[in-house]
């Protein structure tokens, strides 16, 4: 029962519903009340704090997805914004790196988080993926300057469509997909030229949203082709937080910011057991070691593929659809 209670609560049963719901199965003498959930949330807050203070020196995160997720808080006029970082370890497995309360567009909020992770032993990721509006980018250039940047195509696509009339959406969407689904970077650049030719005269602002960020939109093509589907969007965060948003919608939001952070942490922790490794996980260690990939294929294999074991300021070893 100690394992069932958290699952029931996390997946949508409000604390006020516990007693009548469980009495249907266990009888009126079950002795379970909403106070049990109050104790559980306090326990989850302790677990979230311990997670946020853990040592990071033993784990190497090669890829990093970042985003700021807003959740409604019942007892607070402002929404809670969770700064979330999910990483891909050198063995190809996905893992929650950090989650904290902050401001999505604030460089200082992200810098505080990154500095704390670095202090606890985090090594600079090779590549970070996120929305261009995040304050993360200014922060990562300061804390981990060698980390490469990839803008999320999911967010960019939405930004471009917002600058176009609805009548142009179907053709624009098809043209955008030709860019990020291209066979290689050369064909992606040809698709960009086609998009510019089709929409540039009438909608220059929409086209500029892609052409102005082209380098960081096409960065993912420099990595293994098997990883492209993972690296072009922040879908791992979006899909994970679909569960968090559903849970908070059922209960009309957590009662406090601390409870919201703890609930999100526990939901992600529960979901992590179902996360699959990235495609071709053996190639992640090669990326960390500095292997060169051309058109998605290994061009130059480094002699040393041992992941770094100590924190650095960012130095790296030498040697279909949006998803």
Swiss-Prot record:
Q: Which domain of life is it from?
A: Bacteria
Family annotation (InterPro entries)? Transposase_mutator (IPR001207)
User: Which UniProt keywords are given for this protein, alphabetically ordered?
Assistant: DNA recombination, DNA-binding, Transposable element, Transposition
- According to its UniProt record, what is one Pfam family this protein matches? Transposase_mut
The region called Disordered is annotated at 300-323
Q: Which GO terms describe its molecular function?
A: DNA binding; transposase activity
UniProt keyword Transcription regulation, yes or no: no
Where is there biased composition of kind Low complexity? 304-313
> Single Gene Ontology BP term?
DNA transposition
The similarity annotation says:
Belongs to the transposase mutator family.
UniProt function note: Required for the transposition of the insertion element.
What PANTHER family does this protein's entry cite? MUTATOR FAMILY TRANSPOSASE (PTHR33217:SF9), TRANSPOSASE FOR INSERTION SEQUENCE ELEMENT IS1081 (PTHR33217)
Please state what the protein is called. Transposase for insertion sequence element IS6120
């Amino acid at each position: 029962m100690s394992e069932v209670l958290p699952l029931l609560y996390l997946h949508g049963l409000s604390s006020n519903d516990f007693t009548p719901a469980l009495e249907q199965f266990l009888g009126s003498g079950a002795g379970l009340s909403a106070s049990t959930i109050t104790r559980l949330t306090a326990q989850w807050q302790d677990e979230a704090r311990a997670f946020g203070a853990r040592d990071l020196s033993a784990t190497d995160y090669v890829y990093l997805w970042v985003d700021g997720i807003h959740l409604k808080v019942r007892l607070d006029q402002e929404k809670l914004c969770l700064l979330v970082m999910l990483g891909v370890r050198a063995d190809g497995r996905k893992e929650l790196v950090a989650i904290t309360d902050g401001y999505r567009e604030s460089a200082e909020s992200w810098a505080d988080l990154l500095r704390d992770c670095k202090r606890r032993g985090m090594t600079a990721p090779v590549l970070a993926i996120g929305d261009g509006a995040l304050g993360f980018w200014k922060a990562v250039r300061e804390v981990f300057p060698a980390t490469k940047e990839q803008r999320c195509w999911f967010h960019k696509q939405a930004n471009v469509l917002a600058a176009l009339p609805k009548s142009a959406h179907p053709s624009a969407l098809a043209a955008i997909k030709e860019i990020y689904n291209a066979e290689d970077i050369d064909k992606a650049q040809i698709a960009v030229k086609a998009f510019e030719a089709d929409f540039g005269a009438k909608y220059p602002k929409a086209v500029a949203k892609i052409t102005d960020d082209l380098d960081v939109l096409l960065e993912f093509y420099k990595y293994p082709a098997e990883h492209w589907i993972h690296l072009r969007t922040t879908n791992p965060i979006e899909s994970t937080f679909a569960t968090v948003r559903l849970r908070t919608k059922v209960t009309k939001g957590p009662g406090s910011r601390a409870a919201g952070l703890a609930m999100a942490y526990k939901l992600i922790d529960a979901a992590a057991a179902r996360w699959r490794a990235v495609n071709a996980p053996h190639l992640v260690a090669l990326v960390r070691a500095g292997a060169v990939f051309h058109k998605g294929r290994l061009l130059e294999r480094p002699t040393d593929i041992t992941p770094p074991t100590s924190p650095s300021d960012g130095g790296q070893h030498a040697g279909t659809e949006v998803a």
